[in-house]
């Protein structure tokens, strides 16, 4: 009797296991589909030399930086161009031979819309041209700084094409936090996820701006006579710089 009962129990379990699932359960199983995650876009190498770099033929090279050597970041001075608490200070890093604006410092690492710059050079630099390649992964603001001293500076700023703000190209003077637009151009901005070149030249009271090798604006202003050069963006993250060149006449 015990053996017969065991056989019956075994056959019952086998039938239950082999029986097809109810149609409702099968439909539910069909609905469980894992999403396909697209691969992270890779950043192509920056052209070398950068296409569109503008520099006088007889110029003296002050800086040439490709961020491919140890200590490259230590040659630059990181400055937050607006007052922010210590935990919201901007973070810049060198990754795979590029200078990257990398949001804000740990532990928060949050994006922030405040303005930030990486500066290089001496306070007595007066006449020079700075050029750089840049690649925007997801930021929307880029620029170059000239004659930075004690918080005052000139800036050539470009806004990404698909961003709402207009005009897209501006030469600005910033003195003690007050921004004055010296020249503007309502032309298309730059395209994201491709390498572009930006150039800013200061010579006496003449300020000239170039984008991808084409002149965009020229204006005269005599308020600021000397100071460091630099790279500008916002602490949103995702802005890469490479092939920085600074020359003097």
Task: Please provide the spans of the model-predicted regions.
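Short tryptophan-centered beta-strand motifs in secreted/extracellular beta-sheet-rich domains
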Residues: 67, 130-132, 193-203, 207-209
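Extracellular glycan-recognition surfaces and repeat-rich motifs
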Residues: 73-110, 114
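Extracellular carbohydrate-recognition regions
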Residues: 47-84, 243
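Short, solvent-exposed beta-strand-to-loop segments that form ligand-recognition rims
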Residues: 211-230
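Short, aromatic/His-centered strand-loop micro-motif at the edge of beta-sheets
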Residues: 176-197
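Ser/Thr-rich, Proline-interspersed low-complexity disordered segments
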Residues: 4, 8-15, 19-64, 249
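Ligand-recognition surfaces built from glycine- and aromatic
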Residues: 224-249
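Secretory/extracellular carbohydrate-interaction modules
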Residues: 105-174
